[in-house]
Regions:
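Functionally engaged cysteine thiol sites
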Residues: 20, 145, 194-196
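Bacterial Sec-dependent N-terminal signal peptides
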Residues: 3, 10-38
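Terminal, contiguous helix-loop blocks that mediate binding/assembly
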Residues: 131, 155-191, 196-272
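Intrinsically disordered, low-complexity regions
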Residues: 1, 13, 52-56, 267
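A short linear-motif detector with a strong N-terminal bias
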Residues: 15-20, 59, 119, 191
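Intrinsic disorder/low-complexity segments enriched in polar/small residues
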Residues: 3-6, 265
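Divalent cation-coordinating acidic motifs and surrounding scaffolds
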Residues: 25-141, 146, 150-178
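Short secondary-structure capping/junction motifs at helix and strand boundaries
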Residues: 19, 135-138, 184-186
C-alpha cells in the first residue's frame, strides 16, 4: 500500500508540472469559424525542397518571428493563418492568435502528406481559411524558392513559383488557385521568394491582387523580418509601402557591403 501511495503522489506531481508548463503551441483544436474581421492574411510556407536547397530551418525562425509580430496587432480586427509544410513533418493549418495576453499557435487542421504546389491542394487550403476566417479583405504571403520569368540565358521556359521535393507550380495554375478560392481580389501578395517581382508575373496575376510586393532578384536567405512586417500587413493607409519599408529597412540597417555574407549574418542588403 505504501508503494502505491508513493506512486500516486509522483503521478500527481508529474501532472501538476505538466499543467504548469508554459506552452505557446496548442492543438489540434476543434475549429470554429470566427466572426468576420477587417483582414485575414494567409501565409503559405513550402519548406520541404527535398534536396540541398532545403528551407525548413529558416522558415521555422520566420514562424517564430510571425508570432512575435502578432503581439503588436489588434487581434480583434485581424487573423494571421499559416499553412506550414516543413521537412519531416505533416502539413498543418495554424492560427496565430492572442490568448491570455500572449500569442499562441492553434493547429486547426493536420493533413496527410500532399503536394502544396498542386492547384487543388492550394485551392482547398485557401477555401478553408476563408470559411473559418472571413474578412473584409485578404492578404497572401508566399515563402519558398521561385524562378518566375527568368532571363533567357538561364531558362527561357521557366514560369514557376515554389519548390517542393523538386516539383514546381506553373504561375497560371497559381493564378487560378488564388482567383477561384478567394472571394475577392487580394489586398496584397507578398512574395518572400526569389525573382517574383516582374512585369510578367504582375500581368499574369493582375486580377488577383491590388498590390504585389517582392524582389526582381534573389532575396536574403533569412527572408522577411516578420516581427516588423506582420503588423504592417494589417494597416490600411500606404499598406504596400509599409510592408516594403519594414522589409527593406531591416536589411538596410545590417548592410555593410562587405563579403562574404551568410544566413546567420546577412550584411549584403536586398534588391528592390
Amino acid at each position: 500500500m505504501k508503494n502505491i501511495k508513493i506512486l500516486s503522489f509522483l503521478v500527481g506531481l508529474a501532472a501538476l508540472f505538466a499543467a504548469c508548463e508554459n506552452n505557446d503551441n496548442e492543438g489540434p483544436v476543434t475549429p470554429e469559424p470566427r466572426e468576420q474581421v477587417g483582414r485575414t492574411v494567409l501565409v503559405y510556407i513550402v519548406g520541404d525542397a527535398g534536396d540541398s536547397n532545403e528551407l525548413s530551418d529558416l522558415f521555422k525562425i520566420n514562424f517564430s518571428d510571425m508570432k512575435a509580430g502578432m503581439e503588436e496587432v489588434d487581434y480583434s480586427k485581424c487573423n494571421l493563418v499559416v499553412y506550414s509544410e516543413m521537412k519531416n513533418d505533416l502539413p498543418h493549418l495554424i492560427s496565430l492568435k492572442q490568448k491570455n495576453g500572449k500569442v499562441v499557435a492553434d493547429t486547426l487542421f493536420t493533413y496527410a502528406e500532399q503536394n502544396p504546389l498542386d492547384k487543388e491542394v492550394m485551392s482547398k487550403v485557401i477555401a478553408q481559411t476563408v470559411d473559418y476566417f472571413p474578412a473584409d479583405s485578404y492578404g497572401f504571403v508566399f515563402l519558398s524558392h521561385s524562378s518566375s520569368w527568368v532571363s533567357a540565358s538561364n531558362n527561357a521556359n521557366s514560369r514557376s513559383i515554389g519548390y517542393y521535393r523538386k516539383t514546381q507550380m506553373n504561375i497560371p495554375d497559381f493564378r487560378e488557385a488564388l482567383f477561384s478560392a478567394f472571394p475577392k481580389p487580394l489586398k496584397f501578395i507578398l512574395f518572400d521568394s526569389c525573382n517574383m517581382q516582374s512585369v510578367e508575373v504582375a500581368y499574369e496575376l493582375r486580377d488577383c491582387a491590388e498590390y504585389f510586393i517582392g524582389s526582381p532578384t534573389e532575396i536574403p536567405g533569412p527572408g522577411a523580418p516578420y516581427k516588423a512586417v506582420v503588423p504592417e500587413m494589417f494597416t490600411e493607409t500606404n499598406l504596400a509601402m509599409n510592408i516594403a519599408e519594414a522589409y527593406y529597412g531591416y536589411y538596410e540597417k545590417l548592410y555593410t557591403g562587405v563579403s562574404p555574407i551568410s544566413n546567420e549574418n546577412w550584411t549584403g542588403g536586398i534588391a528592390t
